[in-house]
């Protein structure tokens, strides 16, 4: 099924992106699913919701990483997601196009 196919993709190092047509906030759940159920690494799951999606859409010059000249769209979570990917659901800071919308620091 789907899990076995995705695990094959992970083993062959094919670049994947994670997206959703659902309302905001659910993209973290998709990354967590990829990490926990599909046995992907935390790094690949995070790249799947950031730079990989941008590259696969041809938008890496505008979004996908924190780089000078790109849109300042940043989401930060308290804690180390490498140790606990569930922390992606605990958003502490949000910046969109350089404007801060949430700051719990």
List the predicted regions and their residue ranges.
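Small/polar (Gly/Ser/Thr/Ala-rich) solvent-exposed segments
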Residues: 83
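Short aromatic-centered micro-motifs
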Residues: 94
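Short, small/polar residue-rich loop motifs at catalytic or cofactor-binding pockets
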Residues: 87-89
């Amino acid at each position: 099924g789907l899990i076995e196919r995705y695990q094959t993709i992970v083993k062959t190092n094919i670049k994947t992106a994670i997206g959703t047509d659902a309302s905001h906030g659910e993209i973290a759940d998709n990354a967590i699913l990829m990490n926990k159920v599909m046995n992907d690494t935390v790094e690949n799951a995070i790249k799947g919701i950031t730079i990989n999606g941008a590259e696969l859409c041809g938008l890496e010059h505008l979004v996908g990483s924190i780089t000078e000249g790109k849109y300042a769209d940043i989401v930060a979570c308290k804690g180390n997601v490498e140790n606990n990917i569930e922390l992606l659901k605990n958003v502490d800071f949000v910046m969109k196009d350089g404007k801060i919308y949430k700051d719990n620091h």
